[in-house]
Amino acid sequence: DECFSPGTFCGTKPGLCCSARCFSFFCISLEF
């Protein structure tokens, strides 16, 4: 399955972020 890169809009599909979490409608990377 495809997944979204960090910074991608995820408002409609919050579970598809690659190694990231959907926050404020955008994928935010969990690694800093």
UniProtKB/Swiss-Prot annotation:
GO CC terms: extracellular region; host cell presynaptic membrane
GO molecular function term, any single one: sodium channel regulator activity
Task of the protein: Delta-conotoxins bind to site 6 of voltage-gated sodium channels (Nav) and inhibit the inactivation process. This toxin acts on Nav1.4/SCN4A and Nav1.6/SCN8A (EC(50)=2.3 uM).
Organism per entry: Conus consors (Singed cone)
Disulfide bonds: C3-C18, C10-C22, C17-C27
Keyword S-adenosyl-L-methionine: no
Subcellular locations according to the entry: Secreted
Additional comment: Negative results: does not show activity on rNav1.2/SCN2A, rNav1.3/SCN3A, hNav1.5/SCN5A, Nav1.7/SCN9A, rNav1.8/SCN10A, Kv1.1/KCNA1, Kv1.3/KCNA3, Kv1.4/KCNA4, Kv1.5/KCNA5, hKv11.1/KCNH2/ERG1, shaker and DmNav1/para.
Superkingdom field: Eukaryota
Residue ranges of coiled coil: none
Keywords: Disulfide bond, Hydroxylation, Ion channel impairing toxin, Knottin, Neurotoxin, Presynaptic neurotoxin, Secreted, Toxin, Voltage-gated sodium channel impairing toxin
Descriptive protein name: Delta-conotoxin-like CnVIB
Tissue: Expressed by the venom duct.
Domain notes from UniProt: The presence of a 'disulfide through disulfide knot' structurally defines this protein as a knottin.
List of residues that carry 4-hydroxyproline: P6, P14
Family the UniProt entry places it in: Belongs to the conotoxin O1 superfamily.
